Regions:
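An acidic- and aromatic-residue-enriched active-site/binding cleft used to recognize and process polar
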Residues: 91-93, 101-103, 139-141, 253-255, ...
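Short, acidic Gly/Pro/Ser/Thr-rich loop/turn segments
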Residues: 95, 143, 206-209, 491-495, ...
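Short glycine-biased active-site loop of nucleotidyltransferases that positions the nucleotide triphosphate
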Residues: 113, 258-263, 307-314, 431-432, ...
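Substrate-binding/active-site clefts of carbohydrate-active enzymes
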Residues: 153, 157-158, 171-172, 177-197, ...
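Conserved alpha/beta catalytic core and glycan-binding cleft of carbohydrate-active enzymes
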Residues: 159, 362-364, 379-546, 553, ...
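The feature represents the membrane-entry module of six-transmembrane cation channels
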Residues: 202, 373-374, 423, 474
Length: 690
């Protein structure tokens, strides 16, 4: 209660005084900085650490899976004093300070305390509140100061600004209990009870955006062109339900400085990008979609990170998160840096981040980007540009161990949330069980099918017979992994043309007939499905992240009918369990005819354990109408339930309007057969009835 004057003991700004007491006592400082009002503050160094020895030891060992609960900026009350506890891992730093809008960005004011030999720095700053801007000022061993964003920040400034923002993400009231409770069934991966999964891949900033308004001086008057997460949730959920998709997969929403990176060069792994709102807004987005029965999968990038000065690169003046040797630490394709997975604290950072999105945001799956680049030390590199492993091979043993560790812990803590790998090579057992030497993913993108099938579809129909094997080859290896058939964003950029644009044909009608046949084959082929936004209505211009999809195309008959077709095809998929239930069980698929090379046609069955569910699928990849006898599995009546050549979808209307009764005539090695009309450039489905 009686102020005691303090004397400046050092020109760096240290003050001290003598107080004649033998026991600890509570005290505050009365401080006056130049040109500022007098302040009364608590001593930041009088508060106990929030870390236990166990916390730090587990982080040091790479197994503190909830490290995000303490690392970063945490609003809290300690000993009755409100403030924010800051902490950061920077073992090679000479000094670390918290700077922000609460201390004039002055690194002398709040220098952090080093916690033992763990490389963690910490300080509790009284009076700092939610919404404050901050960074870490790191003084390197060379004496150079650097300003770094918080790797564990829950919220970040909108680009081009790069400060972290103190956030409390504990207050959102979730109401998706019913979805979370039933998610194990909704997303079942059981071999005999595989759930339907039809994913709509999208980029939040260009699926739909606002029209920019300008005043008479040409100045923008309506601010951001982006909709808020909450606004997008309402618009997107209506569209997804209308179009009969089951999930959305969102291109990375973690904070990133460069729009043109599409989110794949992340600087804020724990921050949903502020382009579309706050963390609470993003929680609302996921919660709302869950309540509408829509799953949410996030793209996640554990393979590399950008060189931006405010990010992870050379974080404490050393190569902390990346390898020091550029042959190990530099990514040649993207100009980015590769994580040093052998460092426990680095793998802990990434593992806890994946768990964070499942825990705090209720995400239904993580799709890991560029897994192939993680698995191979020589990925994208020439001889002499990479370092072999201890056995002389090109396998990245540290990355393999990291993936197994991550997948093991993730599935243990979130058994009903999915792990999906974008892996483009023939690496074995990507979706194999960890106990059997697999990597432990639930699903793997089928890049082989995508490449082969698109090359086949790009051919003039009259030349497709020469590449017929590309149509059927995927079934030779389909059951080696749990594959998702993907037609993703990567296939509609960089001069590749959109999916509609890839199709052959002198007219739009011919192109769209090809596209309908392609989608029909995809949706009846075993495996889960993914389609990139805009392709469902046949957008002709390549995707551009800076503009909205061309929704105005739906004013044209050919595009509106294409959208109507996609909607109906997705409904077919959902309505018939034979199209998904045994996706990864060989009993769920059977060829009837895969040798009609000259006609470029295939006939196959999709099945469940119940004979009554059996579907006969016929695909014709030529513009020729065939009168065809096909073998069928059972005696009975077969009704055409779907035809991509229907006039309502823009087709010519050739089909089988009446049910067909089988005859006892051996065709395609079957005792029973049907005589049908095969529409041109089309997929048709028949349902069996006794």
């Amino acid at each position: 209660k009686n102020p005691v004057a303090m004397q400046c003991m050092d020109e760096a700004g240290f003050f001290a005084c003598f107080v004649g007491r033998k026991q600890e006592f509570k005290y505050k400082f009365i401080v006056k900085y130049d040109n500022e009002a007098e302040q009364t503050i608590s001593d930041p160094y009088s508060f106990d650490s929030i870390y236990s020895e166990e916390d730090l030891s587990k982080f040091d060992a790479g197994i503190n899976y909830e490290i995000y609960e303490k690392m970063g900026a945490k609003p809290m009350t300690i000993s009755g004093v409100e403030g924010v506890n800051f902490s950061v891992w920077a073992p090679e730093a000479m000094r670390v300070s918290v700077v922000g809008d609460f201390n004039l960005w002055d690194g002398r004011r709040h220098q952090m305390e080093r916690l033992g030999d763990f490389g963690v720095f910490e300080i509790f700053i009284p009076g700092v509140s939610v919404g404050s801007l901050y960074k870490f000022e790191i003084k390197t061993k060379k004496g150079e100061p650097m300003l770094k964003s918080d790797p564990y920040a829950f919220y970040s400034e909108l680009r081009p600004n790069t400060a972290s923002i103190v956030a409390d993400i504990s207050g959102f009231e979730w109401s998706d209990e019913a979805w979370m409770k039933d998610r194990e069934n909704i997303q079942s991966t059981k071999i005999n009870e595989s759930a339907a999964m039809n994913i709509y891949e999208l980029h939040l900033g260009s699926w739909i955006r606002k029209e920019m308004q300008y005043d008479e001086n040409g100045e923008e008057v309506n601010g951001s062109v982006f909709y808020n997460y909450r606004e997008i949730a309402h618009k997107l959920s209506v569209y997804i339900k209308k179009m009969n998709y089951t999930h959305v997969e969102i291109m990375p929403v973690m904070e990133h400085p460069l729009d043109a990176s599409w989110g794949y060069q992340v600087t804020g792994y724990y921050s949903p990008t502020s382009r579309y709102g706050t963390p609470d807004d993003f929680m609302y987005f996921i919660n709302y979609l869950h309540k509408k029965g829509i799953g949410v999968i996030l793209d996640w990038v554990p393979a590399h990170f950008p060189r931006d000065l405010h990010g992870l690169a050379c974080f404490d003046g050393s190569h902390l998160y990346e390898h020091a040797d550029p042959r190990q630490g530099a990514h040649p394709h993207w100009g980015t840096l590769i994580y040093n997975y052998a460092r426990p604290q680095v793998s802990n950072f990434l593992i806890s981040n994946a768990l964070f999105w499942a825990d705090k945001y209720h995400v239904d799956g993580i799709r890991m980007d560029a897994v192939a680049s993680m698995l191979y030390l020589d990925y994208g590199k020439n001889s002499g540009e990479w370092v072999a492993n201890i056995y002389g091979g090109n396998e990245n043993l540290d990355a393999i161990e990291f993936l197994k560790h991550l997948n093991s812990i993730y599935k243990k803590k979130n058994p009903s949330s999915l792990l999906i790998a974008e892996e483009s090579t023939a690496w074995p057992k990507v979706s194999g069980d960890l106990n059997e030497g697999g990597l432990g993913f639930d699903y793997k993108w089928n890049m082989g099918w995508m490449n082969d099938f698109l090359e086949f579809m790009k051919l003039d129909p009259y030349f497709r017979s020469g590449d017929y094997n590309a149509l059927t080859f995927s079934l030779f290896y389909h059951y080696s992994e749990n594959f998702i058939l993907v037609l993703s964003h990567d296939e509609v950029v960089h001069g590749k043309a959109t999916l509609a644009g890839k199709m052959p044909g002198a007219t739009q009608e011919e192109k769209f007939a090809n596209l309908r046949a392609a989608y029909g084959y995809m949706m009846t082929h075993p495996g889960k499905k993914l389609l990139f936004m805009g392709q469902e209505f046949g957008q002709m211009n390549e995707w551009n992240e800076n503009v909205s999809l061309e929704w105005n195309l739906l004013d044209y008959d050919i595009h509106s009918k294409m959208q109507k077709y996609s909607k109906a095809l997705n409904k077919l998929y959902l309505d018939y369990p034979a199209l998904y239930k045994l996706d990864y069980n060989p009993d769920g698929f059977e060829w009837i005819n895969c040798t009609s090379k000259d006609e470029s046609t295939v006939v196959f069955l999709r099945k469940t354990e119940n004979e009554e569910d059996t579907l006969v699928v016929v695909c014709n990849f030529t513009p020729v109408v065939y009168e065809r006898e096909i073998g069928v599995p059972f005696k009975g009546t077969y009704t055409e339930i779907f035809n991509s050549d229907d006039k309502k979808y823009g087709g010519s209307g050739v089909g089988n309007k009446r049910a067909k009764k089988s005859v006892k005539k051996k065709v395609d090695g079957r005792e029973n057969s049907l005589k049908i009309k095969v529409p041109p450039m089309a997929m048709v489905v028949f349902k069996w009835d006794k």
